[in-house]
Amino acid sequence: MTKQDRRPEILVCNDDGIEGEGIHVLAASMKKLGNVTVVAPAEPHSGMSHAMTLGVPLRIKEFRRNNRFFGHTVSGTPVDCIKVALSHIMPVKPDLIVSGINYGSNTATSTIYSGTVAAALEGAIQGVTSIAFSLTTYEHADFTYAGKFARKLARKVLQKGLPADTILSANIPNVPESDIAGVVITRQGRSRWSEDAIERNDMYGNPYYWLNGTLRLQDSEMDKDEYAVRRNFVTITPLSFDLTNRDFLGTLEQWKLQQ
């Protein structure tokens, strides 16, 4: 059987944990395209970025939903899940990795913190075509259109492929399909978090802190992800794990640090 004749093998992961609604919607959507394997963190790991577990053993367990096998949990980060899935759970290399659907957008500087995006980037590092999906809300989430769009984009990526070391990050407004303004290709924006550490005291009088913040819009162009998604556009941003600032290379060479 040739690759064209068989159903694609699709690995599904997230950072909200295996009980998050988004991963169940995404897995169901992907089953219409291929054979699905779900490997996700046992607990929520939002904001873990590209962290991986060292010095502590990882535990893998089967997860059942409604008395039916759904996937495997890993006692680690989203990146751990990708590594373990590729090395020990999946018998063959997947044709596609999809991560999400995340609670909350992953645009602008949020991209750097995102475990959802990191799982997809780890897939690219391992040579697997990968996509990250995020929904722009933390509450009252409606994944109906997001699941539908995820399938549409995944089908196109399976057909067209992606350049090496490149993923797609799709951010989807939490609105009915009728309110979607369109789909735009964007760059990662420059909006940044305005953060605060809220201090409280435990029962012994010792201080502890909750991190709290708001993403402040600093872009005003439709080709920036956060600006566009706030206007009900689905945004698709190509990303890479190569963080080199090429614009600065020439200037840095002029410093003549080798002398």
Curated annotation (Swiss-Prot):
MF annotations from Gene Ontology: 5'-nucleotidase activity; metal ion binding; nucleotide binding
Reactions the enzyme catalyzes: a ribonucleoside 5'-phosphate + H2O = a ribonucleoside + phosphate
Database matches in Pfam families: SurE
Annotated protein name in UniProt: 5'-nucleotidase SurE
Keywords assigned by UniProt, alphabetized: Cytoplasm, Hydrolase, Metal-binding, Nucleotide-binding
Record organism: Chlorobium phaeovibrioides (strain DSM 265 / 1930) (Prosthecochloris vibrioformis (strain DSM 265))
Annotated compartments: Cytoplasm
Gene name for this UniProt entry: surE
Residue numbers binding a divalent metal cation: 15-16, 46, 102
Keyword Nucleotide-binding (UniProt): yes
Lineage: Bacteria, Pseudomonadati, Chlorobiota, Chlorobiia, Chlorobiales
Role, per record: Nucleotidase that shows phosphatase activity on nucleoside 5'-monophosphates.
